[in-house]
Amino acid sequence: MKKIFWAVATLLACAGAQAQSVVYKVDPSHTRASWEAKHFGTSTNRGQWDKTDGEITLDKTAKTGKVDVTIDMASINTGVPPFNNHLKSPAFFDVANHPTARFVGDKLKFDGDKLVEVSGDMTIRGKTNPATLKAVAYNCYMHPSLKREVCGGDFETTIRRSAFDVNWGVVEKFTADDIKVTIQVEAVKQ
């Protein structure tokens, strides 16, 4: 009986040792968040935030982890400087008082080895709401120059901007309330 106990204990200890979280640092040169919104119900306005930061923790064996991405809201870029300034103003994102947006998710869903979605909380303009980022693409590879594993993909969600108190033009339907957000991310194993 003792032999069986020690065999089971050793097996459990080895299984626990194999499951291990790995930290990946977001690569800002390969990570950005972009958005799309209908303008007066006709064309689509698009823009992106050029500066992001964050960390991803993955345990591929246990299929668990955490995603924490921060967006510098002052880095918004539509290609039209007056529009950028309008979006930074108190009418929209109020960047002076809310300089960052953040997504933190710890509910990861896998299909086999592929990450298919991350659920958590999105904070914009000081308001936090649940959000689920669905993977459009996801992969890990050994980076030829860095000689380290890089994981990344394209993740999409649709948010209702009024839920974050970004209300300018919603009633008048100048710009849609539902905004498609895509986060393109690559993160380097530390």
Can you describe what each PLM-predicted range is?
Residues 9-18:
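Hydrophobic h-region of N-terminal signal peptides that target proteins for export
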